[in-house]
Amino acid sequence: MARVCQVTGKRPMSGHHVSHANNKTKRRFLPNLQSRRFWLESENRWIRLRLTNAALRTIDKNGIDVVIADMRARGERI
């Protein structure tokens, strides 16, 4: 399973570890993914989403129904 947020689309980024001596080695910055279950009142069922902490705050702000409607408009299957 890919490390991608289902709501925001955030993916791993690449960058450098930088030591005190300014030596650089490649590394990956991974998104803060969480697996959460949400109750969809309109469909009377649970859905499971793999999303970032930023997406959780978006759901708190806008509501799960609005976020799911946006995902479906993008063509994602829920």
Curated annotation (Swiss-Prot):
- Key word Ribosomal protein present: yes
Q: Which domain of life is it from?
A: Bacteria
User: One MF term in GO for this entry?
Assistant: structural constituent of ribosome
InterPro entries named in the record: Ribosomal_bL28, Ribosomal_bL28/bL31-like_sf, Ribosomal_bL28_bact-type, Ribosomal_bL28_sf
Task: Return any one Pfam family short name.
Answer: Ribosomal_L28
Q: What keywords sit in the KW lines?
A: Ribonucleoprotein, Ribosomal protein
Q: Basic residues bias located where?
A: 13-25
Lipid biosynthesis among keywords: no
* GO CC terms of this entry: cytosolic large ribosomal subunit
Q: Where is this region: Disordered?
A: 1-25
**HAMAP family xref list:** Ribosomal_bL28
- Family of this protein: Belongs to the bacterial ribosomal protein bL28 family.
The protein here is known as Large ribosomal subunit protein bL28
Tell me what organism the protein belongs to.
Answer: Nitrosomonas eutropha (strain DSM 101675 / C91 / Nm57)
